[in-house]
Regions:
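Soluble FAD-dependent oxygen oxidases
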Residues: 1-225
Length: 225
């Protein structure tokens, strides 16, 4: 995609903005263009948002770089903290997603926690590869906190919200999923069957541990028994 939009929910506003600790929604869109005119043309729909008059900050079609973008992510993902994540691929419309995601955006449990609603469209046939699960929209939430005494509450917050998304979810991206807490498909059925066949050939005794299992018992309902 030439234009990659992501709607971020966070309690860390852009520099210079005071939101009083409340969550803010950031429509952060990056793109790769040949010239400024092309950038303005392809990003023009974003400049017609009906909520622009309520924006705390507006930046449109300005140059950026990795050096500009990376510190933003560093601030949102501080070292030395505890993290829990969950995610969903979906083809659901914004009309269907908004009531569910709105609750996630409004109730972020810590200053550092955040949620992303990523425009992945359009999906396309994938080559012969392990990555085989995707949708036109990618949603992920990350709880970030300091103390182990809060582990259960932080993990339950993110898991419970993504259970609410299951009716419209196609599956999960493995890198942001914790299958020991919530079962989810992460490969296309044919690809997963092929994986199991390869394991039967090369690891028939299952010496390699399934990380999505608890104490030797399958925790992921999508794994064949």
């Amino acid at each position: 995609a030439r234009v990659e939009p992501v709607i971020v929910g966070t309690r860390i506003p852009p520099p210079g903005i005071d939101a009083g600790g409340d969550p803010v929604i950031i429509m952060h869109t990056t793109g790769m263009f040949d010239n400024p005119d092309e950038a303005r043309r392809l990003m023009a729909p974003l400049d017609t948002c009906p909520a622009l008059d309520r924006a705390l900050l507006r930046v449109f079609a300005e140059p950026t770089s990795f050096d500009d973008e990376n510190p933003i992510m560093d601030a949102q993902n501080p070292p030395g903290m505890r993290y829990s994540a969950d995610c969903a691929w979906t083809d659901a419309s914004a009309r269907d997603l908004t009531p569910i995601l709105g609750e996630i955006y409004r109730t972020l449990p810590t200053r550092e926690s955040f949620v992303i609603w990523y425009g992945w469209a359009p999906t396309r046939p994938l080559p012969d590869m392990a990555f085989s699960m995707e949708g036109n929209v990618y949603v992920a939430a990350y709880t970030i906190w300091e103390h182990d005494r809060d582990d259960a509450a932080m993990q339950n917050w993110v898991t419970s919200h993504f259970r609410n998304l299951e009716p419209v979810s196609k599956g999960s991206y493995l890198g942001d999923a914790d299958l020991t807490r919530r079962s989810s498909k992460f490969m296309a059925d044919d690809n997963f069957a092929r994986l199991q066949t390869l394991r039967d050939v090369h690891d028939p005794d299952r010496r390699f541990f399934d990380y999505y299992q608890r104490s030797g018992c399958a925790a992921n309902e999508f794994e064949p028994r």
